[in-house]
Amino acid sequence: MKRSCIYPGTFDPITNGHLDVIKRAVKIFDRVIVAVAKSDSKNPMFGFDERVTMVERSVEGLKNVSVEGFDNLLVDFAKSHEINTVIRGLRAVSDFEYELQIGYANAALWSEFETVYLMPSLKNAFISSSIVRSVLRHDGDVSALVPSQIFSLLKG
């Protein structure tokens, strides 16, 4: 039986921390779907199609990883793919408090829904999309924070 998971996020933009979690998930699961949330309510810096493209470029060459956009409930997206496991990255205790609430809410919507929490490596633990956006707004260098495949897209 194939073990599959979904790694959802806004990825505004995708960071080395996200990519780190994806690479860790690939070691555990046979198939990983990176699900890019439309998330209009978050007022993303980058458009939906741009974010999907950035994630696609970032995971090129990773076996058994695919990228899809979604604009519905995560649980509904998961059911449509017959996958009941989601991966979430944790950097700090504050992340866990938020993610635990989301995990419980998803489980309330679908009792078979499981959330697996993975930590990025220490060198990527401080990286967040918010930090990257802040550095970009101030014309700073984000080359150490994001996958090299998307660096040119961020500066464009």
Swiss-Prot record:
Compartment(s): Cytoplasm
Transmembrane regions: none
GO cellular component, one term: cytoplasm
Cofactor(s) needed for function: Mg(2+)
Signal peptide stretch: none
Pfam families: CTP_transf_like
Catalysed reaction, written as an equation: (R)-4'-phosphopantetheine + ATP + H(+) = 3'-dephospho-CoA + diphosphate
Positions with a binding annotation for substrate: 10, 42, 74, 88
EC number annotated for this UniProt entry: 2.7.7.3
Binding positions for ATP per the UniProt entry: 10-11, 18, 89-91, 99, 124-130
InterPro entries for the chain: Cyt_trans-like, PPAT, Rossmann-like_a/b/a_fold
Gene Ontology terms for molecular function: ATP binding; pantetheine-phosphate adenylyltransferase activity
Record's keyword terms, sorted: ATP-binding, Coenzyme A biosynthesis, Cytoplasm, Magnesium, Nucleotide-binding, Nucleotidyltransferase, Transferase
Positions of the record's site feature: Transition state stabilizer: 18
Pathway: Cofactor biosynthesis; coenzyme A biosynthesis; CoA from (R)-pantothenate: step 4/5
GO biological process, one term: coenzyme A biosynthetic process
NCBIfam families to which the protein is assigned, alphabetical: coaD_prev_kdtB, cyt_tran_rel
Quaternary structure (record): Homohexamer.
Summary of the function given for this chain in its UniProt record: Reversibly transfers an adenylyl group from ATP to 4'-phosphopantetheine, yielding dephospho-CoA (dPCoA) and pyrophosphate.
Protein family membership: Belongs to the bacterial CoaD family.
Protein name: Phosphopantetheine adenylyltransferase
Organism whose genome encodes this protein: Campylobacter curvus (strain 525.92)
Gene: coaD
